[in-house]
Amino acid sequence: MSALSFDPTQVFEALAMQPVDSEGFDAAVVEGGGDTLHCVFLWGKDCYNCNLFKQAALLHQQALRQLDLKWFQADVYQDVALGRRFALHGVPTFVFYRRGKRLGRITGWPGLPQFQAAVAKLQAEA
């Protein structure tokens, strides 16, 4: 994948990430229910580290899909209130919910193996 052909928004479609904002966050993510683990990808436009995750996610789509996550995404540079809600110290940040309960968060992209291990731990705590 060349730098010229990389479109960072491709990851949203590739992982079926639903956009959320501060107004609809609770209805979509927290009250969205079910036993599926929800992962909210908080990012910022032109954020270098966010784009590193997006590139990695496009390269490892299948592995990320196999984690059985319901994905959401929000640009916290545009939605500052949502960034404040989570007292972000940096992006990307991944916040996890299940059955209305916030289970944890990952700040920064740790790499695929570490991300998979963290998600597996959360899945096991069902």
What do these predicted regions represent?
Residues 49-65:
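Typically the conserved alpha-helix immediately C-terminal to a functionally engaged Cys/Sec
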Residues 90, 95-126:
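Non-catalytic, surface beta->alpha helical segment in thiol-disulfide oxidoreductase systems
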Residues 47-50, 94:
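The canonical Cys-X-X-Cys-His
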Residues 85-89:
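A short glycine-leucine-enriched loop at secondary-structure breakpoints
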Residues 17-22, 42-44, 61, 66-81:
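Thiol-based oxidoreductase modules, predominantly thioredoxin-like and allied folds used
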Residues 32-46:
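Short active-site neighborhood of thiol/selenol oxidoreductases, capturing the structured segment around
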Residues 1-36, 118-126:
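N-terminal leader/targeting and pre-domain segments
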